[in-house]
Amino acid sequence: MVCTTLYTVCVILCILFIYMLLFRKMFHLIADALVITLIISNCIGWSQGQMFIDDIHYNGNVETIVNATDPFDVRSLCIYFPNAVVGSQGPGKTDGYLNDGNYAQTIAALFETKGFPRGSIVLKTYTKVSDFVDSVEMTCSYNIVIIPDSPTNSESIERIAEWILNVWRCDDMNLDIYTYEQTGIDNLWAAFGSDCDVSVCPLDTTMNGIGCSPASTETYEVLSNDTQLALLNVVDNVKHRIQMNTASCKLKNCIKGEARLNTALIRISTSSSFDNSLSPLNDGQTTRSFKINAKKWWTIFYTIIDYINTIIQTMTPRHRAIYPEGWMLRYA
């Protein structure tokens, strides 16, 4: 009888031991699963701003809505155009400007017909082309810059096209330093301001002027005069003295990097020698540089909206942003 009771107690204890062992294992498994789930969820939340899993891939439709609280937006299209084309408001205007007080809402609504969701179109104005070097930040997933083309600003357009279509690393130049030199073909000096008059004197290895006198600024060679923006190229690996009106112009030493593939340039031309190969109506255009021959700004925007797919397909959304202070470190 005693043995039977002892056996019964042992069996019960074994059953309890096995149950507790299994229960503890299940408890630990459940606890571990919860901890791992919480860690993964937090990591995804922390890295959401820099991960590219939610990046758009434009194929005729933008897939996600812009987050207006995020200044570095990876799901939007920014369009930059001169603020001078926003004319006096009122019906019946024939000057060709954007005279509709609701022009921004109208343009955004028309982009919606092409698949862009509400809130994904950002219209921004600029005062002068040199603003893109000095103050304009381009941080959208796609950026389109519209620049009027005329014989009087053709040089500035070429320079700003070079600037916005490529990535640059820049540092401010201190002209109190005696000489500067450029180290390669991708090394240029960016001059920008209200009036940039820049002249240089190249020096030989003995620091004597080559075709000029370092002590006489009147003998310096003029590289830029009465311009708002200039990308200055001098002979590489040759020291130069620089003369510039620092009150109305700034100078940066810049190194050209890779192409900025999320940015395109549209030049507005009224020239009779218009090059049709640059029109967005030409499907062969792949250089991210277009021309539209028109005088009326509603015609210009209608053309951009209608051919936005052609323009977007020359671009890549995931790319560096542009900041005026120099090297573009952050990716869209």
Swiss-Prot record:
GO cellular component term of the entry, any: host cell endoplasmic reticulum lumen
Post-translational changes noted in the entry: N-glycosylated. Intramolecular disulfide bonds.
InterPro entries reported in the protein's UniProt record: VP7, VP7_1, VP7_2
Localization per Swiss-Prot or TrEMBL: Virion; Host endoplasmic reticulum lumen
Keywords of this entry: Calcium, Capsid protein, Disulfide bond, Glycoprotein, Host endoplasmic reticulum, Host-virus interaction, Metal-binding, Outer capsid protein, Signal, T=13 icosahedral capsid protein, Virion
Molecular function GO labels: metal ion binding
Sugar attachment sites: N67, N225
Main localization category: virion
Domain of life: Viruses
UniProt xrefs under Pfam families: VP7 (PF00434)
Signal peptide range in chain numbering: 1-33
Function noted in UniProt: Calcium-binding protein that interacts with rotavirus cell receptors once the initial attachment by VP4 has been achieved. Rotavirus attachment and entry into the host cell probably involves multiple sequential contacts between the outer capsid proteins VP4 and VP7, and the cell receptors. Following entry into the host cell, low intracellular or intravesicular Ca(2+) concentration probably causes the calcium-stabilized VP7 trimers to dissociate from the virion. This step is probably necessary for the membrane-disrupting entry step and the release of VP4, which is locked onto the virion by VP7.
Record's subunit section: Homotrimer; disulfide-linked. 2 Ca(2+) ions bound at each subunit interface in the trimer hold the trimer together. Interacts with the intermediate capsid protein VP6. Interacts with the outer capsid protein VP5*.
Similarity field: Belongs to the rotavirus VP7 family.
Protein name: Outer capsid glycoprotein VP7
